[in-house]
Each structure stands twice: as structure tokens, then as C-alpha cells.
């Protein structure tokens, strides 16, 4: 059995790590490189960095800190933010990132996924999906440009359909960001994640809702995701990564300790 991964997420805005609630009201939580180093030392399996306003502001993720992170940590890390071209992706990988993640630019041009996959291989192409549960229609919809509240907009895509489309285009991994759960620490959306798991043939990462160690146990055992991403519980010291991994191991979840 493949070990489940614990993935701290660092949202980056203007060179600082920030965290919001339901993608709004972001506050500064620390500096990029020290936080990355801390999580690597605490036993994280991987890190994800999102430059949250890059796509909305029509720019690309700042490369200056990518090489500094690569020098300080020895675990894989993924970067995201406004990557729209092969050249931009190549630059980020050359600076030391192991994977690149595409979200809003893929919604604008789905064929970007296939082009990136052809150039770099599926294994380093991650698709982030910001999924919002619309109670009025009882449906899951994909939103775009979510890093800037003023720029966020609805798309034509239902989440299930977009998951199938990005796989068809050649993505290697999917991060499902459940917007309704983001930052509220009430648990992952097991229902939605289980539904997506049933149509997802690539590794699936759960994002949004972690508040306790039991939430991680539940998302692994009930939704069968490959990794669980979280931010505020790690930034605020609510959960220690080593203690979390021991807890999961004690609950028969395969993890690297």
C-alpha cells in the first residue's frame, strides 16, 4: 500500500505566507523560507506554494524565493500561480520546484494541460480545482481567480465534468480545494471527495477543512484520497506533523514516519 501524504500548504501574497477563511480576509502568518524549512524538518511529505493573486492580477509566480526554498528543504515541493506557458513552467522547474500546479489558466485554456504534459511529463503537472457547493442547485461548481475576492468568478464547469476533462488533457494529480470548508476547520468534505474519487484515476489530494487529527484519519479511510493538504492547523501549531503521523499509523493508515 502506498503511504498517504501530509502536505502543508503555503499561500503566498506579496512575498509573505498568508491564510484566509473561505478564500477571504487573508492575514500574514510568516515568512516563506523559514516556514518551509520548519515543515520539512517536522516530517511533511511535500509542500505546496500558491501565489494566490498571480492569476487574478495577470502575472506569474515570483521566482526569487523558489530557489531559496529549494536550497533549504529536501522534500518535493509544488508551485502555483499564473503559469500560462511552457517557458514559465520550465523556469519554475529549473529554479528547483518538483511540480507545477495550474488552476485558473487551465480553465481559460484547457489545452495548456496537454502541452505541459507533453513537454515535462504527467508526473509533475498538478491541477488545482476550486470547487464550491451551491446549495440552491445542489451542485458542485468550479470557480476561477479565487485568490482575489474581487476577481473571483463562476465558470461553466461542474466540478465532476472538469475533473474528467483535466484527466483527459493529461494531468498527473488533482488537488480538490473545497471552498466552503476552507479555513473553518470542521472537517474535509467526505461526500464530495468520495464522489470525485470514484471518477478520478490520478492521485487525489484533499484540501479544505482540516481541524483535528481525526479529520485526516477520516479523509484517508473514508474518501481514500492519496494526500491531505492543510494550512491553518499547521501554521497555528494546532497539529504537530509528527504527532499526526503517529496518530494515523496507530489508526492503521499507512504513512511515512
Swiss-Prot record:
Keywords: Amino-acid biosynthesis, Cytoplasm, Histidine biosynthesis, Lyase. PANTHER family: IMIDAZOLE GLYCEROL PHOSPHATE SYNTHASE HISHF, IMIDAZOLE GLYCEROL PHOSPHATE SYNTHASE SUBUNIT HISF/H IGP SYNTHASE SUBUNIT HISF/H. The keyword Nucleus does not apply. IGPS catalyzes the conversion of PRFAR and glutamine to IGP, AICAR and glutamate. The HisF subunit catalyzes the cyclization activity that produces IGP and AICAR from PRFAR using the ammonia provided by the HisH subunit. This is Imidazole glycerol phosphate synthase subunit HisF. One of its GO terms (biological process) is L-histidine biosynthetic process. GO terms for cellular component: cytoplasm. The gene is hisF. Disulfide bonds: none annotated. Its EC number is 4.3.2.10. The lineage of its organism: Bacteria, Pseudomonadati, Pseudomonadota, Gammaproteobacteria, Alteromonadales. It comes from the Bacteria. It catalyses: 5-[(5-phospho-1-deoxy-D-ribulos-1-ylimino)methylamino]-1-(5-phospho-beta-D-ribosyl)imidazole-4-carboxamide + L-glutamine = D-erythro-1-(imidazol-4-yl)glycerol 3-phosphate + 5-amino-1-(5-phospho-beta-D-ribosyl)imidazole-4-carboxamide + L-glutamate + H(+). NCBIfam families: hisF. Pathway: Amino-acid biosynthesis; L-histidine biosynthesis; L-histidine from 5-phospho-alpha-D-ribose 1-diphosphate: step 5/9. Belongs to the HisA/HisF family. GO terms for molecular function: imidazoleglycerol-phosphate synthase activity; lyase activity. It is found in: Cytoplasm. InterPro entries: Aldolase_TIM (IPR013785), His_biosynth (IPR006062), HisF (IPR004651), IGPS_HisA/HisF (IPR050064), RibuloseP-bd_barrel (IPR011060). The keyword Zinc-finger does not apply. Heterodimer of HisH and HisF.
Amino acid at each position: 500500500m502506498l503511504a498517504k501524504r501530509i502536505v502543508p500548504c503555503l499561500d503566498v501574497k506579496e512575498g509573505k505566507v498568508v491564510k484566509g477563511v473561505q478564500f477571504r480576509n487573508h492575514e500574514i502568518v510568516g515568512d516563506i523560507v523559514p516556514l518551509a524549512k520548519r515543515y520539512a524538518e517536522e516530517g511533511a511529505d511535500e509542500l505546496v506554494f500558491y501565489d494566490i493573486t498571480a492569476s487574478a492580477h495577470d502575472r506569474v509566480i515570483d521566482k526569487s524565493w523558489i530557489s531559496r526554498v529549494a536550497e533549504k528543504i529536501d522534500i518535493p515541493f509544488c508551485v502555483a500561480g499564473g503559469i500560462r506557458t511552457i517557458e514559465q513552467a520550465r523556469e519554475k522547474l529549473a529554479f528547483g520546484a518538483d511540480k507545477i500546479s495550474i488552476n485558473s489558466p487551465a480553465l481559460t485554456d484547457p489545452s495548456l494541460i496537454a502541452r505541459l504534459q507533453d513537454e515535462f511529463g504527467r508526473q509533475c503537472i498538478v491541477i488545482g480545482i476550486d470547487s464550491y457547493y451551491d446549495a440552491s442547485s445542489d451542485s458542485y461548481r468550479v470557480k476561477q481567480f479565487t485568490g482575489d475576492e474581487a476577481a473571483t468568478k463562476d465558470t461553466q464547469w461542474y466540478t465532476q465534468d472538469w475533473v474528467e476533462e483535466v484527466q483527459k488533457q493529461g494531468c498527473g494529480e488533482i488537488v480538490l480545494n473545497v471552498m466552503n470548508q476552507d479555513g473553518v476547520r470542521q472537517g474535509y468534505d467526505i461526500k464530495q471527495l468520495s464522489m470525485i474519487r470514484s471518477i478520478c484515476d490520478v492521485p487525489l489530494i484533499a484540501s479544505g477543512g482540516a481541524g483535528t487529527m481525526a479529520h485526516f484519519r477520516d479523509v484517508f479511510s473514508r474518501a481514500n484520497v492519496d494526500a491531505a493538504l492543510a494550512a491553518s492547523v499547521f501554521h497555528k501549531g494546532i497539529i504537530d506533523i509528527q504527532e499526526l503521523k503517529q496518530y494515523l499509523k496507530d489508526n492503521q493508515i499507512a504513512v511515512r514516519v
